[in-house]
Amino acid sequence: TKHKIISEIAEKTGLLVQTGGGIRNMETLERVLASGVKRAILGTGAVKDKSFTCRAIEKYNDAIVIGIDAREGMVAVDGWTKSSNNYAVDFAVEMEKIGARTIIYTDISRDGMLKGTELSVLEEMVAKTGMDIIASGGVADFTHVLEAKKSGAAGIIIGKAIYEGKVDLKKCLQNV
């Protein structure tokens, strides 16, 4: 199962693992956290069930990260298949009010495209909240990492660019 694989990764590597996807109730959240992950990412669950999100943050504090996946600034849900009526920055502010401390902001129109991170929404989110905002989506080279850092991002998620050898992770970790 997914949870068994995640548990093995956390146990065998000693890495601090975070995971998301399908966490929409306390039972699933507790199973995920029991598998050895450091942080659980609430995405659609946070958008669709504020009561669940409040309970999760109240009980697990910093182990909860809010994943805001957005297309053209609007929050997407259900595996990116539907857009909501929530503007990403407004939703981040709302999540901060209920106690969230960390956001992973993904511009899904750029995820895996290697075209750089869309900075305007990221910068606005950083400016309007006191949370740690982690940027995700579009990183193609070290310049994009520096741009995200300059915009105020607390961190950045790099995927495809590492797999394809376009970004040297060691260089990023040493220089940012």
PLM features: what roles do these ranges have?
Residues 1-18, 54-69, 114-141, 176:
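Alpha-helix-loop-beta-strand connector modules within alpha/beta enzyme cores
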Residues 3, 26, 47-50, 85-89, ...:
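Structural motif corresponding to alpha-helix initiation and N-cap regions
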Residues 21-22, 42-45, 106, 111-114, ...:
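Glycine- and other small-residue-rich loops at beta-strand/loop junctions that grip anionic moieties
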Residues 112-114, 142-145, 164-167:
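Short active-site-adjacent structural elements
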